UniProtKB/Swiss-Prot annotation:
Propeptide: 23-48
Keywords, alphabetical: Amidation, Amphibian defense peptide, Antibiotic, Antimicrobial, Cleavage on pair of basic residues, Fungicide, Immunity, Innate immunity, Secreted, Signal
Job description of the protein: Antimicrobial peptide with activity against Gram-positive bacteria (S.aureus, MIC=32 mg/L) and fungi (C.albicans, MIC=64 mg/L). Shows weak hemolytic activity.
Tissue specificity annotation: Expressed by the skin glands.
Organism of this sequence: Agalychnis dacnicolor (Giant Mexican leaf frog)
Family assignment from sequence similarity: Belongs to the frog skin active peptide (FSAP) family. Medusin subfamily.
Modified residues (Leucine amide): L67
Name of the molecule in the record: Medusin-DA1
Listed InterPro entries: Frog_antimicrobial_propeptide
Length: 68
Protein backbone atom coordinates (compact mmCIF):
# COMPACT_ATOMS: atom_id res chain seq x y z
CA UNK A 1 0.00 0.00 0.00
CA UNK A 2 2.82 2.41 0.85
CA UNK A 3 4.42 1.62 -2.51
CA UNK A 4 1.21 2.59 -4.31
CA UNK A 5 0.99 5.87 -2.39
CA UNK A 6 4.58 6.75 -3.23
CA UNK A 7 4.03 5.85 -6.88
CA UNK A 8 0.84 7.91 -7.02
CA UNK A 9 2.52 10.92 -5.42
CA UNK A 10 5.43 10.59 -7.84
CA UNK A 11 3.10 10.46 -10.84
CA UNK A 12 1.13 13.47 -9.60
CA UNK A 13 4.31 15.43 -8.88
CA UNK A 14 5.77 14.70 -12.32
CA UNK A 15 2.45 15.63 -13.91
CA UNK A 16 2.40 18.97 -12.11
CA UNK A 17 6.00 19.69 -13.10
CA UNK A 18 5.21 18.85 -16.71
CA UNK A 19 2.12 21.05 -16.62
CA UNK A 20 4.01 24.01 -15.17
CA UNK A 21 6.72 23.68 -17.83
CA UNK A 22 4.07 23.68 -20.56
CA UNK A 23 2.36 26.72 -19.05
CA UNK A 24 5.67 28.58 -18.91
CA UNK A 25 6.40 27.81 -22.57
CA UNK A 26 2.89 28.90 -23.51
CA UNK A 27 3.35 32.18 -21.62
CA UNK A 28 6.70 32.82 -23.34
CA UNK A 29 5.14 32.16 -26.76
CA UNK A 30 2.31 34.59 -26.01
CA UNK A 31 4.80 37.25 -24.91
CA UNK A 32 6.81 36.81 -28.12
CA UNK A 33 3.62 37.03 -30.17
CA UNK A 34 2.55 40.21 -28.35
CA UNK A 35 5.98 41.78 -28.87
CA UNK A 36 5.87 40.93 -32.57
CA UNK A 37 2.38 42.45 -32.92
CA UNK A 38 3.55 45.59 -31.12
CA UNK A 39 6.56 45.89 -33.44
CA UNK A 40 4.29 45.47 -36.46
CA UNK A 41 1.96 48.20 -35.17
CA UNK A 42 4.90 50.56 -34.66
CA UNK A 43 6.13 49.90 -38.22
CA UNK A 44 2.66 50.61 -39.64
CA UNK A 45 2.46 53.83 -37.63
CA UNK A 46 5.84 54.95 -38.99
CA UNK A 47 4.67 54.22 -42.53
CA UNK A 48 1.48 56.21 -41.96
CA UNK A 49 3.48 59.15 -40.61
CA UNK A 50 5.77 59.11 -43.63
CA UNK A 51 2.86 58.82 -46.05
CA UNK A 52 1.17 61.74 -44.29
CA UNK A 53 4.22 63.90 -44.95
CA UNK A 54 4.17 63.35 -48.73
CA UNK A 55 1.54 66.04 -49.47
CA UNK A 56 3.45 68.49 -47.29
CA UNK A 57 6.69 67.74 -49.15
CA UNK A 58 4.97 68.12 -52.53
CA UNK A 59 3.49 71.42 -51.42
CA UNK A 60 6.88 72.68 -50.25
CA UNK A 61 8.57 71.62 -53.49
CA UNK A 62 5.92 73.27 -55.64
CA UNK A 63 6.22 76.48 -53.59
CA UNK A 64 9.98 76.47 -54.05
CA UNK A 65 9.68 75.82 -57.78
CA UNK A 66 7.31 78.80 -58.13
CA UNK A 67 9.87 81.04 -56.43
CA UNK A 68 12.79 79.84 -58.48
Amino acid sequence: MAFLKKSLFLVLFLGLVSLSVCEEEKRENEEEKNEQEEDDREERNEEKRLLGMIPLAISAISSLSKLG
